[in-house]
């Protein structure tokens, strides 16, 4: 039996109606570039992705928490964020199929 990938479903509200859509890797990258924020779970780890402006420049935040341990990282671009090996020497791309939302 072939291994099936877990689908990540994103829910959002538009004009008071709730929509659901599969969150593919390409859509995830698009939404990050469009200033959407995310929260994922990986085993017992919470992964929050956010953005803010620092001196008029957009920066991306990666906040990782597991119990009392918390890590907060700042990146200058989506490419830097998704390629950084923050998860046991793996990047977001490497762990994409393991993430749950």
Predicted regions and their residues:
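Short linear motifs embedded in intrinsically disordered, proline/glycine-rich low-complexity segments
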Residues: 1-5, 60-66, 101
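Mixed-charge, Lys/Arg-enriched low-complexity segments
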Residues: 4-13, 70-101
């Amino acid at each position: 039996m072939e291994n099936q990938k877990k689908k990540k479903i994103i829910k959002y509200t538009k004009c008071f109606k709730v929509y659901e859509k599969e969150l593919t890797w390409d859509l995830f990258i698009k939404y990050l570039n469009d200033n959407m924020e995310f929260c994922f779970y990986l085993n017992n780890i919470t992964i929050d992705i956010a953005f803010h402006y620092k001196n008029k420049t957009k920066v991306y935040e990666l906040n990782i928490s597991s119990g009392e341990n918390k890590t907060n990282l700042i990146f200058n671009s989506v490419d830097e964020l998704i390629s950084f090996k923050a998860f046991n020497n793996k990047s977001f791309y490497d762990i994409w199929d393991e993430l749950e939302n």
